[in-house]
A protein has these predicted regions:
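Short, Lys/Arg-enriched N-terminal segments with co-localized hydrophobic residues
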Residues: 1-9
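Residues at the C-termini of beta-strands that transition into short coil/loop
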Residues: 16, 129, 185
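Phosphate/diphosphate ligand-binding glycine-rich loop within oxidoreductases
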Residues: 42-146
Length: 186
């Protein structure tokens, strides 16, 4: 039996469907979890995370699986190439995965595939990275800024390509309306 719609957190495809208040709540919760890990050590007890990697990443794998374990849950990891997703019927695979787990995190090559997941999941879905967005990286960066400077009200300079990180930074700072983002891109 799945939770009622209003009890399911929003899918984290990017920041478009999140308000500044919702993003701030996520950051506040993350800060509290870091400060009081014992308070959350059973928060996800009995919950199962499915991690799917089309794009490899040691850091993404370890951060999600360690986090899930520290919160009392379990995880199942799969590489895209070792899954039935490669057979070309992703919607039926998405539905099957949703019947067996409580949350999905996928690091995928194309944003279109992330959107396909977002349109078809019945459990919360987190975009671990795609060619257009990298929301989890930006949340981690924002948390570090808050820890080091006390707030997001900083001048932030991004130097690099206009890529998924840049897109998510622009989206995040536009939502939060705190601080100033400067970008030097080729």
């Amino acid at each position: 039996c799945r939770k009622k719609e209003e009890d399911i957190m929003k899918n984290m495809l990017n920041f478009k469907n999140f308000s500044a208040e919702e993003l701030q709540k996520i950051l506040d919760l993350a800060l509290d979890m870091k400060k009081n890990p014992e308070k959350y050590s059973h928060a996800l007890e009995g919950k199962k995370l499915y991690t799917l990697f089309e794009k490899t990443s040691t850091r993404t794998f370890l951060s999600f699986t360690t986090g899930m374990t520290e919160l009392g849950g379990t995880y199942y990891n799969q590489l895209w190439k070792d899954s039935n997703f490669v057979l070309g019927e992703p919607v039926s695979e998405i539905k099957y995965v949703c019947r067996n787990v409580d949350i999905i995190m996928a690091r995928l090559v194309k944003n279109e595939t992330v959107e396909l997941f977002g349109d078809n999941v019945t459990v919360p879905f987190i975009n671990g990275c795609d060619n257009s967005y990298h929301p989890c990286q930006i949340l981690a960066d924002a948390l570090t800024i808050i820890e080091k400077f006390g707030s997001l009200n900083v001048k932030f300079l991004y130097i690099g390509a206009k890529n998924n990180v840049f897109n998510s930074l622009v989206e995040f700072f536009s939502k939060m309306k705190q601080g100033t983002l400067y970008g030097l891109t080729p």
